[in-house]
Regions:
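Short beta-strand->loop structural element characteristic of the AMP-binding/adenylate-forming
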Residues: 1-34, 107-109, 159-166
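Short hydrophobic/charged patches on amphipathic alpha-helices used for structural packing
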Residues: 14, 81-84, 174
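Conserved S/T- and glycine-rich ATP-binding loop of Class I adenylate-forming
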Residues: 25, 92, 98-101, 135, ...
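Adenylate-forming
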Residues: 25-37, 182-190
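ANL superfamily adenylate-forming
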Residues: 31-89
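Conserved pre-ATP/AMP-binding loop-to-beta segment of ANL
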Residues: 73-97, 104, 128-134
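Conserved AMP-binding A3 loop
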Residues: 93-119
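Conserved AMP-binding/adenylation subdomain of ANL enzymes
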Residues: 116-134, 141-190
């Protein structure tokens, strides 16, 4: 898994997805889809593009989120168990890329064990309560803090994640905080 910033150029997106050998890309808007399609020919490993938040149907390699989830629901418990058992602690879980301001982005590879240990350490350090924690996801998921907290840590303890609007950092976050009333709220120093 790797995250790509929505502000990245099409060329930066192509570089990162090719470097990561991504075979599935998830985009959250028609704009991001068009950006990706403009460099699609440079991505030989890419097999599918999933468009999140759109109900539209597409041809070929682009599918909407609901159709993507339906594909997963067809997997039986046995196949899922086999995939889980096929994972090893030293296998890659995520490649976290730098912003690439001065050159091509650099990728830092985090293993399954690294992510698991980091989540367990954060749960213990912050005394998170299993099945009771509620958090708001508002940082770009391409950021490692969002990946650890929103994708791995809170789900690993049965907590709840509320995804804020795309414009959360432009003013709507306070409204979301008031409505959701999270048990924890994290942020980054600027």
């Amino acid at each position: 898994m790797t995250g790509v910033y929505t502000t990245n150029t099409a060329e930066a997106v192509a570089y990162q997805l090719k470097h990561a050998k991504s075979n599935i890309a998830v985009v959250d808007s028609e704009n991001q889809l068009q950006k990706l399609m403009s460099v699609r020919h440079k991505l030989p490993d890419l097999k599918h593009i999933v468009l999140y938040g759109e109900d539209q149907s597409y041809e070929d390699e682009v599918i909407n989120w609901d159709d993507f989830l339906a594909l997963g629901s067809r997997l039986g418990d046995e196949e899922l168990r086999e995939r889980l058992e096929g994972q090893a602690i030293n296998q890659p879980a995520v490649i976290c890329y730098t912003s690439g301001t001065t050159a091509n982005p650099k990728g830092a590879l985090l293993s399954q064990d690294n992510v698991t240990w980091t989540c367990a350490s954060a749960v213990a350090t912050y005394n998170l309560v299993e099945a009771e924690e509620v958090m708001i996801s508002y940082l770009p998921v391409s950021h490692i803090v969002a990946q650890i907290a929103d994708i791995w840590m809170i789900p690993s303890i049965g907590g709840t994640i509320h995804f804020a609007d795309k414009d959360a950092l432009k003013g709507s976050l306070l409204k979301t905080l008031t409505a959701v009333r999270p048990t924890r709220f994290g942020g980054l120093l600027h």
